[in-house]
């Protein structure tokens, strides 16, 4: 009889823990949903706290266009090839004037308008930290195109992330960007498993490198980082579309925020099909990050 009572007590304790946790997450969800009210956009959110194990998701069934957020999984696929010995950080790649496509975001093109030779490490740095489109396509060519990235994701059981087109293809046709999509929780899972290095996804050198260049991201200062204290550590990757007929297909930021108490917030925010201004789209993301920061810091 005592054993039965103990089992019942354990089950009751577990039940109330789950109810309490869900109630807490629901409270955060309500705060975020207040930000989303009356916004003329489809907004997807996934948040996971490393200590609390709370999971929050909003509009998770929608396929959000990633734009340059895709450079994070592309970089992981390249690093995987480096770890296998098929490529190396020091390997030099010639970039010709023909590679420097017009009308695309590229610090490489700005710095080396006549072409140059860079190491794979340097190209990865440009591609992730500075979101270089030309660097992205060069890396894709090195590993065999988008199919290789998809195979990497599938082999490591990352579902609900699709990468079918490179930057050049996306720039030629507005609708092509929708072939590169993710759900918020799928992107968050990629962040979490990479950060935890689940199943030794990367070697130590590659692991340290990807998080270094994610922390050094120069784009999107008004998004996840926008309203956080100045010295907050945020390792993140942004994604931004153009505007067509008054609609911005994608204003995104995904990453890992480190709280002063050491807790980690894994967060993915996608703002799609927005008729709002670029400033409002970015503020949606920074508002969500700030609310989440305050919520977990003051629990």
UniProtKB/Swiss-Prot annotation:
<feature type="binding site">
    <location>
        <position position="131"/>
    </location>
    <ligand>
        <name>a beta-lactam</name>
    </ligand>
</feature>
<dbReference type="InterPro" id="IPR012338">
    <property type="entry name" value="Beta-lactam/transpept-like"/>
</dbReference>
<feature type="active site" description="Proton acceptor">
    <location>
        <position position="167"/>
    </location>
</feature>
<feature type="binding site">
    <location>
        <position position="71"/>
    </location>
    <ligand>
        <name>a beta-lactam</name>
    </ligand>
</feature>
<comment type="function">
    <text>Class A beta-lactamase which confers resistance to the beta-lactam antibiotics, including penicillins and cephalosporins, in E.coli strain JM109. Acts via hydrolysis of the beta-lactam ring. Has penicillin-, and cephalosporin-hydrolyzing activities.</text>
</comment>
<keyword id="KW-0378">Hydrolase</keyword>
<comment type="similarity">
    <text>Belongs to the class-A beta-lactamase family.</text>
</comment>
<feature type="active site" description="Nucleophile; acyl-ester intermediate">
    <location>
        <position position="68"/>
    </location>
</feature>
<dbReference type="InterPro" id="IPR000871">
    <property type="entry name" value="Beta-lactam_class-A"/>
</dbReference>
<dbReference type="InterPro" id="IPR045155">
    <property type="entry name" value="Beta-lactam_cat"/>
</dbReference>
<dbReference type="InterPro" id="IPR023650">
    <property type="entry name" value="Beta-lactam_class-A_AS"/>
</dbReference>
<feature type="signal peptide">
    <location>
        <begin position="1"/>
        <end position="23"/>
    </location>
</feature>
<dbReference type="Pfam" id="PF13354">
    <property type="entry name" value="Beta-lactamase2"/>
</dbReference>
<keyword id="KW-0732">Signal</keyword>
<dbReference type="GO" id="GO:0008800">
    <property type="term" value="F:beta-lactamase activity"/>
</dbReference>
<keyword id="KW-0046">Antibiotic resistance</keyword>
<dbReference type="GO" id="GO:0046677">
    <property type="term" value="P:response to antibiotic"/>
</dbReference>
<feature type="binding site">
    <location>
        <position position="167"/>
    </location>
    <ligand>
        <name>a beta-lactam</name>
    </ligand>
</feature>
<protein>
    <recommendedName>
        <fullName>Beta-lactamase VEB-1</fullName>
        <ecNumber>3.5.2.6</ecNumber>
    </recommendedName>
</protein>
<dbReference type="GO" id="GO:0030655">
    <property type="term" value="P:beta-lactam antibiotic catabolic process"/>
</dbReference>
